[in-house]
């Protein structure tokens, strides 16, 4: 892994996404500029934290960060653009939504969206960079809450448990009940459930 050097500038935003792999719902992104005067203890990759810890940190991030913003790309945008381009669009939206313009943006992963300020992709940034960790927590808590809401509307799919990922249970329910309007029609298992697959 390449050595990461934190940029020597004041206003650094971290950006991360949640929801590239699921078959249903939006891909959700977050951008966060932390306040050096208000450190937050325990920031880490959201996937490595318990749900209870994520929720507590989410509240603390919203309270202490200089600013934060959420972005998203809806299922129809994912189907039109493909998941990679839709994710880049959602990241751009999160950065554009910040009330303070960052001087530098650090993105989790290996590629950056086109932004009007300097940016750098950081592999495993969600466990290496506090701003990206904070963004990953906001994005995951937001998307998980959306899946819980969707679960209330469509209780037989189990969205609250699998968050829309292609688990055996989700694939079985897709076969039994078909796709909802929230499913991503360009994804293979959904295509097959709708009878749209060419194979």
From Swiss-Prot:
Belongs to the RNase HII family. Its EC number is 3.1.26.4. Manganese or magnesium. Binds 1 divalent metal ion per monomer in the absence of substrate. May bind a second metal ion after substrate binding. Its main location: cytoplasm. GO terms for cellular component: cytoplasm; ribonuclease H2 complex. It catalyses: Endonucleolytic cleavage to 5'-phosphomonoester. It holds the Pfam family RNase_HII. It comes from Klebsiella pneumoniae (strain 342). This is Ribonuclease HII. One of its GO terms (biological process) is mismatch repair.
